[in-house]
Amino acid sequence: MSEFTVRGRFPARYGEQNFEKNVEAPNEDVAQERVYANFGSQHGLKRTQITIDEVDA
């Protein structure tokens, strides 16, 4: 598995909050899915509320 850096933003109390997460995944699509799942469980956000701008290997 490779390590991917996923950058994006999500709505916070006062505007948008930028984020950068490092995740291990076999490909970029799985890395995005893991970020969606992580933010959904930790912050209670829906997938449509999370904007992923960039995925780097």
UniProtKB/Swiss-Prot annotation:
Cross-referenced Pfam families: Ribosomal_L18A (PF01775)
One cellular component (GO) term of this entry: ribonucleoprotein complex
Record carries keyword Cytoplasm: no
GO molecular function: large ribosomal subunit rRNA binding; structural constituent of ribosome
InterPro entries xref list: Ribosomal_eL20, Ribosomal_eL20_dom
S-S pairs: none
HAMAP family reported for this sequence: Ribosomal_eL20 (MF_00273)
Family to which the UniProt record says this protein belongs: Belongs to the eukaryotic ribosomal protein eL20 family.
Assembly and binders: Part of the 50S ribosomal subunit. Binds 23S rRNA.
Protein name: Large ribosomal subunit protein eL20
